[in-house]
A protein has these predicted regions:
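Surface-exposed, extracytoplasmic segments of Gram-negative outer-membrane nutrient-acquisition systems
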Residues: 1-9, 43-127, 135, 144-202
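Membrane-embedded beta-strands that build the outer-membrane beta-barrel scaffold
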Residues: 15-25, 33-41, 132-138, 143-151
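Active-site-proximal structural scaffolding
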Residues: 2, 10-15, 30, 129
Length: 202
């Protein structure tokens, strides 16, 4: 028996804007160039995670489990906040022994070994706020060529290869990245005994 059940009970609100501009800069008997610019932006909010039939114990749940090595979630889905929020410890420094210093819930620095669940915070968001694309179609007689460039802006990513393989302690399990012993924050490398930690540095 399982203590929980998955249900499609949530409500989310989305709003955004999309702008599309097209032009034909060149058009002759045998040649045509059509160009199109497209811009879009979107924002969202988790309105509710419950309904009349199903209800979560709290107004949030965690997602994005990193696996047995780290045993931490990467995201939080919370009522009143955006989807895609990274949630974890904010790393602000390394101490003289090469161990993480994080920002505590009171805003003050504290050693990673003294971490508490309450010290976790929203570290960023993995959903792009802006999209921009530029599409060009060139037609010459019966031949055509299409070139498209697309960009996504104002979002964060989690670099999991660095999280796992840029930490000296991982040498006990295999190869490391060449940057594993580079100074962190320009100060010193991580300690050989600093455990894998999901922090904002990555």
């Amino acid at each position: 028996l399982y203590p929980t059940i998955l249900a499609n009970a949530g409500t989310m609100k989305n709003k955004g804007l999309e702008i599309r501009l097209s032009a034909i800069p060149v058009q002759t008997k045998n040649f045509q160039w059509v160009t199109t610019f497209n811009y879009s932006t979107n924002s969202n909010e988790v309105v509710s995670l419950s309904n009349n039939q199903f209800r979560v114990e709290r107004g949030y749940f965690y997602a994005g489990y990193l696996g047995n090595t780290i045993k931490q979630d990467t995201h939080i889905v919370k009522e009143g906040e955006q989807m895609g929020n990274f949630y974890g410890f904010k790393s602000i420094d390394v101490d003289e022994n090469g161990k993480w210093i994080i920002q505590g819930k009171d805003g003050n620095p504290k050693p990673i070994d003294q971490q508490q669940q309450e010290d976790k915070m929203v570290l960023g968001n993995g959903l792009p706020k802006h999209f921009l694309s530029w599409d060009n179609t060139f037609t010459f007689k019966n031949f055509d060529l299409n070139l498209t460039m697309r960009g996504a802006f104002k979002y964060q990513i989690l670099n999991t290869p660095r999280l796992y393989y840029e930490v000296p302690v991982s040498l006990a399990h295999g190869n490391l990245m060449a940057t594993a012993y580079d100074p962190v924050f320009g100060k010193r490398p991580l300690n050989d005994h600093q455990e894998l930690q999901y922090v904002s540095y990555y």
